[in-house]
Regions:
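Secretory/periplasmic and organellar redox-cofactor proteins
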Residues: 1-63, 83-90, 94-113
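Amphipathic, interaction-prone secondary-structure segments
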Residues: 63-71
Length: 113
């Protein structure tokens, strides 16, 4: 993960930063593992007016992992709106990361978009 200070410098948005101190050591390890394992599995990324959406295959294990990641992410980044959506007829799973003005710049810096 990118350091808090480098995110602030890259994004130019000082009000958005990951507060990893909001998680204990075990949660930080798990968060890092889930980010590394799950995010590369996205099939598509869409830019939204207030953030980004990532399409994943419809898979129960993947959905459970994304749900756990969303819960941990909310601890360190409470300014994000995190939506996990299963679409009808066994369609894809969407993970949406959105928020107030400036969140999109933060996400670009954090995710290297």
């Amino acid at each position: 993960m990118v350091s808090t200070e480098s995110i602030r410098q890259k994004s130019g948005v000082s009000s958005f930063f990951c507060d990893f101190s909001a998680m204990d050591q075990e949660q930080r390890k798990r968060h890092s593992l889930l980010v590394g394992e799950l995010l590369p599995k996205h099939l598509e990324m869409k830019e939204l007016p207030d953030g980004y959406a990532f399409r994943f295959p419809n898979d129960q294990v993947l959905f459970a992992g994304l749900s756990e990641l969303a819960t941990l992410e909310q601890l360190c980044c409470p300014f994000l709106t995190i939506t996990l959506e299963l679409q009808h007829d066994q369609g894809p799973t969407w993970l949406k990361l959105t928020g107030n003005d400036g969140v999109k710049d933060f996400l670009r810096a954090e995710l290297g978009i």
